[in-house]
Amino acid sequence: PNNDMVFQLTDKLAFPDPHYGDPDGLLAVGGDLSIDRLILAYSNGIFPWYAFREELIQWWCPMDRFVIFPDEIHISHSMRTLINKGKYEITFNEAFQDIIQTCGELRIEQEGAWLGTKMMEAYTHLHEQGFAASVEVWEEEQLVGGLYGVTLGRCFFGESMFSLVPSASKL
């Protein structure tokens, strides 16, 4: 039942049923970015987002999601060639802070500055508790791409990525 409602969160650690969100997936506003709230949110398919240049946390739960199943990934010939060249080194959780900082750089022309200080701190706390991870792509010891996201059980929720050279974020 979609009633196009947006709920105001309180201090209570709870979310409304995602089916009550608006058609685009906006479910609620307010609340906080505590580890417990973030874990509850992601466990229910809900994620936080700040509207561009606004302070109010928005909680989203779109009904349609893009899901990648590892055993169904097809690596294109050109990507396989790039991997086999050995030009890049890939690491995990070696530079989480660098990844999130680079992802959070203000991109006013794209209205993509949702990853402000509060969000970066929240994801850093998740990382410190083992609930967020990063993937780094290096070229000659220079960070040239990467992504970070939330890890719960066997699921990884990719949040943001960047690439400073062609295809680095695809690796």
Question: Where does each model-flagged region fall?
Answer:
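N-acyltransferase acceptor-side catalytic subdomain
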Residues: P1-L171
